[in-house]
Regions:
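A flexible loop/linker signature enriched in serine peptidases of the S9 family
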Residues: 2-8, 23-33, 46-51, 67-95, ...
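Hydrophobic beta-strand positions that form the internal "hydrophobic ladder"
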Residues: 20-21, 64, 128-129, 176
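Short loop/turn segments that connect beta-strands within beta-propeller blades
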Residues: 36-40, 100-104, 148-152, 197-199
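Residue-level detector of Asp-centered blade-edge/turn motifs that repeat once per structural unit
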Residues: 15-16, 59-60, 123-124, 171-172
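A structural motif specific to WD40 beta-propellers
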Residues: 43, 106-107, 154-155
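Gram-negative outer-membrane assembly/targeting C-terminal domains
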Residues: 125, 173, 193-196
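Right-handed parallel beta-helix/beta-solenoid
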Residues: 17, 50-53, 61
Length: 199
């Protein structure tokens, strides 16, 4: 599908299977692109310095949510560019962003600090589940949180002392699958879990 040198990754498909959104450094920065899979035509979604990745379409295909870093200070910008030149990023300070599928109405969804990432739409399309360590004093643990698409009504979902991330709903909204290193006997194993979801 892509053949450019560099980083083309983190791809997900629209619900109708006609489009793909992915992260690429083809511009010299890590930006999001939407590709029509039939024609191969692309649209660049993001245009601001920082890492934009991990994007998902809403269930109706009309919106996109993703994680992004936005280095602001001269020191942070310098560090980001130096790491990027080596093909690296430091994903420690990220917020969630949302926009329409055509790139319009782009806005920041969270302003929590630390790392807010792995967002996924609830099947009704009105809420987003994501992983965050914003309540952690030392960067750990990560728990799952739910937030409305307008940035209101933040709610904590899991209460783990380890790592919960990569949430995915079943299409009917009855089940939630996620990755966690809970119940691993103190080791570093990360396993998959599934839970019944009740609104």
């Amino acid at each position: 599908i892509t053949s450019a040198k560099g980083y083309d990754a983190e791809a997900t498909l629209s619900p109708d299977g006609k489009k793909m959104i992915y992260c690429s450094d083809k511009s010299g920065d890590l930006e999001l692109y939407v590709m029509d899979l039939k024609s191969g035509k692309e649209m660049r979604v993001t245009n601001e310095l920082g890492y934009d990745g991990g994007a998902w379409f809403s269930p109706d295909g009309n919106k996109i949510v993703w994680r992004a870093s936005r280095p602001k200070t001269p020191e942070a910008i310098k560090e980001y560019k130096e790491l990027l030149a080596e093909g690296l990023v430091e994903p420690t300070d990220m917020e969630l962003y949302i926009c329409n599928a055509d790139g319009s109405d782009l806005r920041q969804l969270t302003d929590l600090g630390n790392a807010n990432w792995s967002p996924f739409f609830h099947p009704l399309g009105k809420k987003i589940l994501f992983s965050s360590n914003f309540e952690a004093e030392r960067g750990f643990p990560f728990n799952l949180y739910l937030i409305d698409i307008d940035g209101k009504n933040l709610e904590r979902v899991t209460h783990s002392e380890t790592f919960d991330a990569f949430p995915v709903f079943s299409n009917d909204g009855k089940y939630l699958a996620f990755s966690s290193n809970r119940n691993n006997g103190g080791g570093r194993d990360t396993n998959l879990f599934i839970a019944e979801w009740k609104d």
